[in-house]
């Protein structure tokens, strides 16, 4: 009996040591509350909004300093620009028949390029050309192009004072074409077309120049027009009409009508 009681006590001690399992608690256990998932979703949404929100501390939105450009580099100084432009060089060929007028008007030709543009100018009689080069006094990056256009206009036959407008104004251009570009003419027909453009004593040419506010050079079969884009078109249309055979009176009437429209517009 003592042995049985001792064994019973050992079994009872083992049962007390093991955790009790309640079937009722397992059946009645509630599922986890969805509030945690909602909180997690809220956390995700908040983090998404935070990620999509603009970054106010973006360095690109910071104001650009006055001493730097948008690219982050400081602008070049006038001295630095002059060092960049010092190697630019142009050589403008001069036709043989314009070499004598070039020597006569040389002072009036190179003075504005030196004083206004700061260029170095040299006449090269061997090459029959005028050479231009930028210097430390050249400030404008387009100065050498203006000088080249000025010399080219003089080489085509324009007067120095007329060509000087290319240096003072920015909206002037040169337009050149040949009579054969409009109509193929030969012999007396070509001579009559040139005569219609020039007129007696150059009256027709002067009338076109005054009406269109341009300057025209008639060099054999080549026609050169100096002026703004709109005025060049007016003068070119008048010259083309004369080449195609229109009488000068009809061209005059058309120029007057165009001039009246221009005055009303401006």
Swiss-Prot record:
Family listed: Belongs to the PNO1 family.
Function text: Required for small ribosomal subunit (SSU) synthesis. Has a role in the processing of early nucleolar and late cytoplasmic pre-RNA species.
Localization: Cytoplasm; Nucleus, Nucleolus
GO molecular function: rRNA primary transcript binding; unfolded protein binding
Pfam family, one: KH_PNO1_2nd
Entry annotated with the keyword Cytoplasm: yes
Polar residues: bias regions: 15-26
One of the GO biological process terms: ribosomal small subunit export from nucleus
Protein name in the entry: Pre-rRNA-processing protein PNO1
